[in-house]
Regions:
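Signature of short aromatic-glycine-proline-rich micro-motifs recurring in repeat-based ectodomains
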Residues: 42-48, 99-109, 164-175, 274-289, ...
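Surface loops at the rim/top face of extracytoplasmic beta-rich domains
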Residues: 51, 55-75, 100, 113-331, ...
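Conserved blade-ending motifs and adjacent loop-strand segments that build the rim/top face
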Residues: 401-425
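Loop/turn-rich, solvent-exposed surfaces of beta-rich toroidal or solenoidal domains
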Residues: 329-402
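Bacterial N-terminal signal peptides that target proteins for export
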Residues: 2-12
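A short helix->beta-strand "capping" segment at the edge of beta-propeller domains
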Residues: 27-42, 150-154, 348-354
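N-terminal signal peptide c-region/cleavage motif recognized by signal peptidases
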Residues: 20-23
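Blade-level signature of beta-propeller repeat domains, shared across WD40, Kelch, NHL, RCC1
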Residues: 421-447
């Protein structure tokens, strides 16, 4: 395996057209480069990069697990500081299940991390579980007296039952409103036969207003939060959980509260719908992000057999249905093959980007670029798990029905192994988590001073 020592190594991306006009090729500088930040093998299975707003310049890398395929292993958060991975992990989480898509899969720093030292992690826990598969667990941690090491013990905020080791979602971010957003997959069974993605609670399926099961046959375990993005106030606890707080026991304390603007927040109006839900209709919103400039949400939702999609939610909106398992991309979903056209119904919102399978297979949601490379600013960058191609949406126009995009190269033309996620630095620089090589990369260009070259 190729390794890198002492210096960063850069690979120029080979620019190729996917589906876009010639004029749109100008969205990226001609010398756009991926610069390797640390040597190959620095991480076991990197899945994302985060940066606290504390002025330290450090990067925190989510290392999903040590032993992929193990039902009881460890995962960690590691720090890149001054261009090197610190020998001691920031946090090591024991008893992590890492089969399929499981592991340590989400990290979010509190907006006030610089003063309160609090952060949140999502992982799949081995051992006792509520549902058929390992629970998804949201835990609150704090930093120790050593800024590079966290306290090992945290407080569980929420446990969510699951039915399989895939479609775990698991991404978490604080929105511009200060609330925590958490993405959930639909449980992993092909086609979502239980209707989890369209079920908002005990009373109905939003899609067709008929009674919903929302649990596997005969199990008695409910999976109301699967196929959703939920929104929580993790700064305020609840003394006595309301009946519609689906991840808590009614009447018992909870480590979170419900933001009043959530679509089903009112227990009087929605006694049987889950107050935690922010939006729904997802298959596996594996990676999502907020535009740091205006708070808009960009969601990569992994498709079933035929299409991948990027969803968009304006900052001012709530309660949107992104239509899985009614639709896959712009098409009506069917286990026998999708058909053209999917009419939005029951508040349904179509995606902004759709692309077909072959050789692509699973979208990896990215970020709207707000970093130092001026030509990239305002462009949405994302990837695909099967090809590791880097895609850039050509100046997303939120009011447009669809967005165009280009590809900046695909394996073997880029140095990327397997793209698993992205992350922003505090300065807006964009990073790529490369599971294939156990490293991370940064988008760079000679057209900015930060990379050591004077621009024209």
């Amino acid at each position: 395996m190729l390794t890198w020592k002492h210096i960063f190594h850069s690979f120029a991306l080979l620019l190729g057209v996917l589906v876009v006009s010639t004029a749109a090729l100008a969205i990226a500088p001609s010398d756009l480069t991926l610069t390797q930040v640390v040597p190959n093998g620095s991480f076991n299975h990197p899945i994302g990069i985060r940066a606290p707003n504390d002025g330290s310049g450090r990067l925190f890398v989510i290392d999903r697990c040590v032993s992929e395929g193990s039902s009881a292993t460890t995962g960690s958060i590691k720090i890149v500081k001054n261009g090197a991975v610190l020998a001691t992990p920031f946090l090591t989480i024991p008893n992590v299940a890492c089969v399929g898509e499981q592991g340590v899969i989400g990290l979010a720093f509190d907006p006030n991390y610089a003063t309160n030292g609090t952060f949140y992690v999502v992982y799949t826990a081995s051992g006792a579980k509520i549902g058929a598969s390992e629970d998804q667990v949201l835990t609150r941690y704090t930093v120790s007296a050593n800024a590079d090491v966290a306290n090992a013990t945290g407080t569980v905020v929420m446990r969510v039952p699951d039915i399989a080791n895939n479609h775990n979602g698991g991404d978490i971010h604080f929105g511009p409103d200060g609330f925590l957003y958490w993405s959930m997959g639909d449980g992993g069974v092909q086609g979502d036969p239980n209707g989890f993605a369209q079920c908002t609670g005990r009373s109905s399926k939003i899609a067709n207003n008929t009674p919903a099961i929302c649990h596997t046959s005969g199990s008695g375990v409910t999976y109301y939060l699967l196929g959703k993005i939920i929104r929580l106030d993790v700064h305020t606890t609840t003394a006595s959980a309301a009946a519609n707080m689906c991840a808590s026991t009614p009447g018992q304390p909870a480590q979170y509260s419900i933001p009043p603007g959530n679509p089903f927040a009112s227990v009087a109006t929605f006694p049987n719908d889950c107050a935690e839900i922010f939006n729904w209709g997802f298959r596996n919103p594996f990676r999502f992000s907020f535009d740091r400039s205006n708070g808009d949400m960009y969601i990569g939702d992994v498709g079933q057999n035929t299409y991948e999609e990027i969803d968009y939610q304006p900052a001012a909106s709530v309660g949107q249905n992104f239509q899985w398992n009614l639709c896959e991309g712009f098409h009506t979903y069917s286990s026998n093959g999708d058909t053209a056209g999917c009419t939005p119904a029951f508040g349904g919102v179509p995606p902004k980007i759709e692309y077909p399978h072959g050789p692509t297979c699973a979208v990896v949601g990215g970020y709207l670029y707000r970093g130092p490379i001026q030509q990239l600013r305002g462009q949405y960058i994302f990837s695909d798990y099967c090809t590791s191609a880097i895609y850039i949406s050509a100046s997303p126009a939120p009011a447009s029905a669809t967005w165009t995009y280009v590809t900046l190269g695909s394996a073997p033309f880029t140095p990327l192994g397997v793209v698993y996620g992205f992350g922003e630095g505090a300065d807006g620089n964009l990073y790529v988590a490369d599971d294939g090589h156990g490293t991370i990369w940064r988008f760079t260009s000679g057209f900015i001073f930060q990379d050591g070259f004077e621009g024209p």
